[in-house]
Design a protein with these regions (language model features):
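Non-transmembrane "mature" sequence context
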Residues: 1-129
Length: 129
């Protein structure tokens, strides 16, 4: 099993190279247990667009960015909270710092992804605000 460290450089390379629908299924359905309908709202796409893709097809760039942001935040949250279950729970729970939306919902844009990573950094270093 290859372990990927989701750094900004590796994430950028991954986005440029493309993310397959297979990875989408592993992340969205396998790790986060999010429905296609809910993910489509988060990613700003349609369920129909997602359904048309075969496992080896590449996701549209914006959708791939959301998947990569999910994995990057998940990796950091797992390091901080010590387990994948706690990571997913935190990422899917409403967060007052994010205006009451969950970190997963905030990951629909680069700005939201930066904000989520910033919050995780503050938690990691014990800076609560």
């Amino acid at each position: 099993m290859v372990i990927i460290k989701y750094t900004p450089v590796s994430c950028r390379s991954m986005a440029v190279g493309g993310v397959q629908k297979r990875a989408y299924n592993q992340v969205v359905h396998g790790i986060f247990k999010i429905s296609d309908k809910d993910f489509a709202v988060i990613a700003g796409t349609s369920v129909r667009s997602l359904a048309r893709l075969r496992p080896d097809d590449l996701l549209p760039f914006q959708t791939a960015e959301v998947i990569i942001s999910l994995m990057r935040a998940h990796q950091k949250a797992t390091e901080i909270f010590g387990s994948e279950e706690k990571s997913v729970e935190w990422l899917k729970s409403p967060n007052t710092v994010l205006g009451g939306i969950s970190p997963v919902q905030a990951l629909n844009s680069r700005f939201g992804a930066e904000e989520v990573m910033d919050i995780l950094g503050r938690i990691e270093y014990g800076v609560y605000s």
